[in-house]
């Protein structure tokens, strides 16, 4: 993580924690975030943490070395965006088409509590944050992980295989090299500690459809980056996040282009969207 997202983890009495202790801390964090996950998902989150810890020295995935710190600064940090994103990605809010192509979930099913989006692109996924975490939480959402560093992309593919995440696709390339199409029509594009906001939105221009939600995970609100946005881009919302066990600022920034402004709101009020709201909306967390 960059220096702008430096943090102090609130220390537990023991510096060395086994899987059982990590599971208890994860459960406590999920409760604080008002997230209810099935046991299988919790198990996969812990399995992913084990992979991240095991292969970190080989792939240089993160500067965080201690498993409990990884749990807080990576897993819980990524999980903190699940509820606010799910609230904005229910079927009424992303009905219709993106980039001219119908959205399809991992199994071609409509979005629900475990699939508030049909297609997500995680830009600069690194060690899989937040993309792998979202793939575990949203098993019916197609997740595209974009990571140009070959060894990190190899780790992401290994995670997808070992965690049985068949709905994950890894792109060992720069995001600018991706082209939208029927298999890549994102209704959510996001990044975490990836680049400046101007560089981020510049790279994703070709993938952004009229109703695509664009989000960036940041620590302290980057006022200089916001002021430097061009091309009709602006920050529509700044959502403060509270990550369990972490003494640090976290924010989720939602961005929009002036040309697309109001598109998502209009889709919310579309008769077809209202008709599907009760059936496909996300579960309360």
Label the predicted regions.
Residues 2-114, 151-152, 158-166, 274-279, ...:
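Class I SAM-dependent transferase core
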Residues 4, 137-285:
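S-adenosylmethionine
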Residues 35, 59-62, 68-69, 73, ...:
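Flexible, active-site-adjacent loop/turn segments at secondary-structure boundaries
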Residues 91-93, 116-126:
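Conserved class I S-adenosyl-L-methionine
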Residues 105-106, 111, 125, 134, ...:
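Residue-level detector of alpha-helical hydrophobic segments embedded in or interacting with membranes
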Residues 122-125, 129, 148-151:
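Hydrophobic alpha-helical segments of small multi-pass membrane proteins
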Residues 127-140:
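Conserved SAM-binding loop of SAM-dependent methyltransferases across substrates and taxa
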């Amino acid at each position: 993580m960059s220096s702008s997202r430096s943090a102090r983890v609130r220390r537990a009495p023991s510096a060395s924690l086994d899987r059982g202790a990590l599971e208890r801390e994860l459960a406590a964090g999920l409760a604080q975030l008002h997230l209810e996950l099935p046991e299988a998902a919790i198990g996969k989150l812990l399995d992913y943490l084990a992979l991240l810890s095991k292969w970190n020295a080989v792939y240089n995935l993160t500067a965080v070395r201690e498993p409990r710190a990884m749990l807080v600064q990576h897993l819980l940090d990524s999980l903190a965006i699940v509820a606010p994103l799910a609230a904005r990605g229910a079927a009424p809010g992303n009905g219709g088409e993106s980039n001219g192509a119908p959205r399809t979930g991992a199994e071609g099913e409509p979005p629900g509590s475990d699939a508030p989006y049909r297609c997500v692109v995680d830009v600069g996924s690194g060690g899989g944050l937040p993309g792998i975490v979202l793939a575990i939480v949203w098993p019916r959402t197609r997740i595209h992980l974009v990571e140009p560093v070959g060894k990190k992309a190899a780790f992401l593919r290994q995670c997808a295989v070992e965690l049985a995440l068949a709905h994950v696709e890894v792109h060992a390339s720069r995001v600018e090299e991706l082209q939208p199409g029927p298999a890549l029509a994102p209704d959510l594009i996001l990044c975490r500690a990836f680049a400046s906001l101007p560089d981020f939105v510049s790279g994703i221009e070709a993938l952004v459809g009229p109703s695509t939600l664009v989000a960036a995970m940041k620590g302290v609100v980057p006022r200089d980056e916001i002021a430097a946005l061009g091309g009709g881009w602006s920050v529509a919302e700044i959502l403060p996040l509270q990550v369990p066990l972490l003494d640090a600022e976290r924010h989720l920034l939602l961005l929009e282009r002036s040309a697309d402004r109001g598109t998502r709101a209009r889709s919310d009020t579309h008769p077809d969207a209202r008709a599907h709201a009760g059936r496909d909306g996300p579960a309360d967390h």
